[in-house]
Amino acid sequence: VCAQACDSFYIDTAYGFPFFQFFTEELPRVVQALFASSPLREDNFVVGFAMGGNGALSFALRKPDFFSAAVNLSGGIGCMVDEFNYSQQMKEVPMPRLRHAFGYPNRNAVEPDHLFKLATQLCQTPHILPSLYIAVGENDFIRNTVRRERDALQRAGLPFHYEEAPGLGHEWKFWDIYFKKALEEWLPLKRKPIY
């Protein structure tokens, strides 16, 4: 299921739009009601491209009891694990939509969306760690940001799988290849009816 995030960065925004709640509570209930789908943690995954990649990572780290795995493809803005990435984007990225979602740089009320502390805490309860898969194109303009995110996950002690795609950038050519790879190789899909 692909749903519109309206430049919310997949969080409950600073000014009243609860997108994190929508994606992690409301949408799963709708999916369960409309489609033959499993409510079990082991059968629930989240995948995102670009801003959605950071959203996917955030969902899995904040709701590890519901999402067993997350795939972050080219995620380089929004919810961040790396403290430097997070503070720099809040100060320097000239995007009104970023401010509309997170609030202004001096606003510290978005603590749940700063993921390093959460990632570190999750390592203390390894029985609920989600499987994490991160990939970025070698020529992606946000590759260095993604590398800092990778390094922050390592510092936090979270296990994950990381790949860089040679010759590819922030583009559908990369996402098509790696979304297929996620479905065929990374995610533990059962590939059988659940009804």
Where would I find each of the regions flagged by the language model?
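Non-catalytic cap/lid and distal C-terminal segments of serine-dependent acyl enzymes
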Residues: 1-195
